[in-house]
Amino acid sequence: MIEIRVIGMPAPQGSKSFKGYRNGRGIMIESSKKVKPWREAVKWAAIETKVMMPGNDPVVCEMVFSLPRPKSAPKSVQHPFRKPDLSKLVRSTEDALTEAGVWGDDARVVGFGNTRKVFAGGSEQDSMTVPGAV
C-alpha cells in the first residue's frame, strides 16, 4: 500500500467554460480557480513521496478528503454531504497523480476502496487536522 498525504483545500474538477475559438478550435478552461492549487499540492506531495507505480497492473485507490466543517453544521452531522462532489474530487486528484508520474494513466484505476469525505479534525479514521487528503 502506498500513502500520500496532501495538505491543502481539496477542489473538485468538473465543468469547463467555453471562452471562444483559437485556430479553429474551441477554448475551454476550468470553471473553478481552486482546482489548479489543489492539483499542484497533490502533484508535489506525490513527487516528494517518490511514489511510482510502473507497469500496467490494475490499481485500487482509497482517498479520504478532509474538508473544513462549516460553522452552520450541527455537531451531530458526521460527514460533509454538500459540495464539493466526491466524484469530482477524485477526478482532480487522479489527474494530479497522473501529472506527477505516479502512474502512466488513471485508466489503471479499476476500483475504489475506502473513498469518502470527512470533516477535518474529526474523529474519523484518516481524518486530517487540516484540510487535505490521504
Q: What is the role of each PLM region?
A:
Residues 1-134:
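Acidic, proline/glycine-enriched N-terminal capping motif
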